[in-house]
Amino acid sequence: MSEFRQATDAFASNPVESKQEIRNYTMNFGPQHPAAHGVLRLILEMDGETVVRADPHIGLLHRGTEKLAESKPFNQSVPYMDRLDYVSMMCNEHAYVRAIESLMGIQAPERAQYIRTMFDEITRIKNHLMWVGSNALDLGAMAVMLYAFREREELMDVYEAVSGARMHAAYYRPGGVYRDLPDRMPQYKESRWHKGGALKKRNAGREGTMLDFLEEFTNTFPARVDEYETLLTDNRIWKQRTVDVGIISPDLARAWGMTGPMLRGSGIEWDLRKKQPYAKYDAVDFDIPVGTNGDCYDRYLVRVAEMRESNRIIKQCVKWLKANPGPVMVTNFKVAPPSREGMKDDMEALIHHFKLFSEGYCVPAGETYSAVEAPKGEFGCYLMSDGANKPFRVHLRAPGFAHLSSMDAVVRGYLLADVVAMIGTYDLVFGEVDR
């Protein structure tokens, strides 16, 4: 008899040892884990490699954004919105400025509405490019991140050209947008890395206006999405890691208040851009991609299809904006600042400018809820005014908070390695979760 068999028989014959049970153990996942997507801390109860329970701990990025917004004039809180979901900046701004416009009873000019629609979709593509690259990286497909950031860099240049900032744009304003689209795109300058033919190639398409640049981008982007799909969609390893992993049924998705790709991946066709149109979404043509199985693979397919639909919307907006010049800010000077030229010649205009940006404006008493279809789901802003120049109450509805609440119900029964895939498809950003 082998030594192993003898040891096993001795263990089984010991009445004390045989009564002992194998107990589950606890594992801390994050907040320093590279796949935690920020500061997610999961306390996992494990039975071997199988997850028995998952407790998400949040609050490590709490900055008191709602209370900060309540301490500032209405027009000074727009930059705070950029720093919530810091991958979907202008969509956050859109919800906030729409809430102010609703209380004040004003509407942005038509050209500003088209610009907002276009930049919402540029933001959606930027978000999904970041997501597809980082999610693939989490699961071991490293090349996709390099491909995705190639196009994302071009859209970052568009952000910078229109607002001066690559991320925190603060471009939307109550009553319109900060300024009209620029007549030129920034170009790369000669350096030790870029010169000669390579420099000329990088600056191709940047000689004209921003709309010319975006028109060229929309013509080439579908082929770039095909490249991402070549790397992932039929990849055997990718499908093994995502198919039938993290299945969320339609009933479960509704029960947890899911929105965006998380909800549409489960087969529910709900999109605020179609169901409750805002800006100019009722004037553009696009489809709502939905999944069938509700697993990680379906959520991936939904986001890839959304990039194609966003590209369609941008193309339509560019066509309209080229043909229809006009104002991008309301003429209500209670909300809109005077021109820079006017301030230099007119003392009243200078006083008006100073008062507007130091004290702001009083918003009529009332309350409203404004929501937009952000890349991650429904991002909403509940705004209450008591008639002063500062909000009485600001509450922000972050899609990631509702999605993270379902983590325990979704990951139970899956392996530890599958948790990384599921967290990736949640597309969490803790700036908005913790607020």
UniProtKB/Swiss-Prot annotation:
It is an enzyme of class 7 (translocase). It is found in: Cell inner membrane. It is a peripheral membrane protein. Gene3D superfamilies: Cytochrome-c3 Hydrogenase, chain B (1.10.645.10). The keyword Hydrolase does not apply. Transmembrane segments: none annotated. Belongs to the complex I 49 kDa subunit family. This is NADH-quinone oxidoreductase subunit D. It comes from Xanthomonas axonopodis pv. citri (strain 306).
